[in-house]
């Protein structure tokens, strides 16, 4: 071997050893790994709004949020969804709102720059529905410009062509509480209220409080919305009280012991807002747990405070195990054993929302987070199975039972086209992405190439099998999904 080649090999070996050492140094004593899940600034901005509404802002280090937001403002004056996007309008409006709520003057140079970008992009009237919702909660937008969500939606039977279980898990856990919020249309009184009239490009007195039209078939939803609004104005909303009560019960049933809802901040914030609308007190244990759960998603350092959209210990732990073993670390080494046993403890043996559409499956999956009983997912479960398969644990029989449970659950989650989705079975009614409320186009959870590929990777890597016909169907699905350039679409990121 040439000296130059030997040097390169040594550098690679040293890099692997250093990486292994680093991974081991950040393992939690309980056995798991957990790193920050980065996001744009809307999550933290909305957390500021939540605490202002509940009056709990003085008990959190929210003054550090100002530093966090200022550090991420770009030269063009806006805040971005991804690097170099030129400034996202809705994200920038929410960051501006949060800074104003934190006491920053509208004449502050940072806000003046943000204001210029906001107005250049059309102002508040051009923002997404959820941004308008958050502004409406404190009187900075008119509820007339938001779509109606009749609470009787909660009462639609599971076998009806549309019901809450036709929404993706994240849309469902966020929307059910909003059935209460949109019905009540609250304007909460907060300490040191603000107005954002300066952010209406057309002038606040010239705003048309109407949903935008697309000029296609989806405009039928605008007509329906006009009907819902007329019914509200006449105080004729069928089964209104029953729907609100059903939504309230649904929320309470799905709160984890740790206070979480759905494992994601939007569901947690919306659930807390819904309960605020129903006059729950800040000292109620349900609310205290919910606010504490939001705190648990926060990252505080010396001069900064932000809130993650979600936490990822199960995902991080599975990948850490695989990385260590793949790089030569002994699969029966103590850190691997501890991590593997922690993962087995985290296997979810309760039925969740997935069971509504999947009557055949039995529990045995994993979720992304520490606690999320109702929403395990296929992607995490497949990665955990691969990690456990590689690890050598003292109780191999217990490990085998965990893997078998997961395999059986995953097999029952195969969708009709042949692929796998993340959280649900056959959750694919595309028309839902056309409703005015769903302007983020994320209302459903169809099968995707990346999750399907993960399942096939698991089957091959772990020498596992499913019904041959189902395997062939999944391969056919993947081949059909390949794009003309040769690539596949990655819904769940570059994974």
Residue ranges and their predicted role:
Residues 1-495:
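Preference for long, amphipathic alpha-helical scaffolds in soluble/luminal domains
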């Amino acid at each position: 071997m040439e000296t130059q080649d030997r040097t390169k090999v040594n550098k690679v070996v040293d890099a692997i050893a250093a990486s292994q050492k680093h991974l081991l140094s950040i393992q939690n004593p309980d056995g798991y790994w957990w790193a920050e899940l980065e996001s744009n600034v809307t999550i933290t901005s909305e957390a500021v709004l939540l605490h202002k509404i509940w009056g709990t802002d003085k008990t959190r280090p929210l003054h550090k949020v100002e530093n966090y937001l200022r550090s991420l403002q770009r030269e063009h004056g806006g805040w971005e969804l991804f690097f170099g996007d030129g400034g996202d309008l809705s994200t920038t409006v929410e960051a501006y709102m949060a800074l104003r709520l934190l006491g920053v003057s509208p004449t502050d140079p940072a806000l003046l720059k943000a204001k210029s970008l906001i107005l250049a992009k059309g102002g508040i009237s051009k923002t997404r529905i959820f941004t308008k919702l958050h502004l409406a909660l404190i009187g900075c937008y008119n509820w007339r410009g938001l779509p109606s969500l009749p609470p009787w939606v909660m009462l639609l039977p599971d076998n009806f062509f549309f019901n809450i279980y036709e929404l993706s898990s994240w849309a469902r856990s966020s929307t059910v509480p909003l059935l209460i919020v949109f019905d009540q249309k609250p304007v909460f009184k907060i300490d040191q209220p603000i107005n954002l009239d300066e952010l209406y490009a057309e002038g606040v007195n010239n705003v048309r409080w109407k949903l935008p039209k697309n000029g296609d078939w989806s405009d039928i939803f605008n007509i329906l919305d006009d009907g819902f609004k007329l019914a509200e104005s006449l105080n004729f909303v069928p089964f209104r009280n029953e729907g609100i009560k059903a939504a309230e019960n649904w929320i309470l049933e799905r709160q984890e012991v740790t206070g979480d809802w759905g494992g994601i901040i939007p569901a947690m914030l919306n659930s807390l807002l819904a309960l605020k609308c129903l006059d729950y007190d800040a000292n109620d244990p349900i609310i205290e747990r919910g606010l504490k759960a939001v705190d648990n998603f926060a990252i505080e350092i010396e001069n900064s405070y932000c809130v993650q959209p979600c936490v990822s210990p199960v995902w991080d732990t599975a990948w850490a195990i695989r990385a260590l073993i793949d790089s030569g670390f002994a699969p029966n080494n103590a850190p691997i054993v501890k991590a593997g046993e922690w993962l087995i403890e985290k296997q979810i043996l309760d039925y969740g929302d997935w069971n509504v559409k999947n009557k055949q499956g039995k529990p045995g999956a994993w979720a992304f987070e520490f606690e999320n009983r109702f929403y395990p997912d296929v992607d995490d479960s497949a990665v955990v199975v691969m990690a456990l398969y590689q690890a050598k644990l003292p109780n191999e029989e217990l490990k085998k039972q965990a893997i078998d449970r997961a395999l059986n659950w995953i097999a029952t989650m195969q969708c009709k086209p042949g692929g796998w989705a993340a959280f649900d079975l056959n959750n694919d009614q595309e028309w839902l992405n056309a409703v005015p409320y769903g302007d983020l186009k994320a209302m459903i959870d169809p099968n995707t190439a990346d999750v399907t590929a993960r399942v096939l990777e698991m089957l091959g890597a772990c020498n596992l099998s499913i019904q041959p016909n189902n395997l062939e169907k999944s391969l056919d699905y993947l081949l059909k999904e390949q794009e003309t350039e040769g690539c596949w679409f990655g819904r769940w990121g570059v994974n």
